[in-house]
Amino acid sequence: MKELYFITSNKGKLKEAKEKINHLDIEIIQLKLDYPEIQASDLKEIALYGLDFCSERFKSPFFLEDSGLFIEELNSFPGPYSRYVHETIGNDGILKLLLGASNRNAYFKSVIGLYNNGPIIFEGVSKGKISKEIRGKGGFGYDPIFMPENSEKTFGEMSTEEKNSYSHRGKALDNMVKYLENGVE
């Protein structure tokens, strides 16, 4: 079995990744390695910086993931600042910002950076809308307020398997899995 390190401290992200990759002969190992996250408006730029920084300190194959919630009514806010905004105002704060808003369209975007003899980027997008209230206790982050297209449930109301079928991270992981299935060393 090959080892592939996932640089994250987020157990929810780790669980999603393991479920997507479990059919491959690859062991996903969590690595809690702090790296600076540059302030940029582009998730791909942030991921590439993280890959470059971590590859200078860690020599085994690894991947990292950055994602953001982009809300149309708020001019794509919080976007790449999603983690900070969630830690600061949380889901309640986002719902307050959208009080009275008729446009609740939003999308999650995930960028996975894989480093294995060089950087490779995989992306995934999940379109949907922001619910009017917090619903569900599953998942993490904005999951209890994001409803993907073609679902009346929020990510917070879904099982991990169900969420993965809609998830931006799930789509980015699928793209990485297709790459890994081709036997890339």
Name every feature range the model reports, one short phrase each.
Residues 2-5, 12-185:
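Anionic-ligand binding patches
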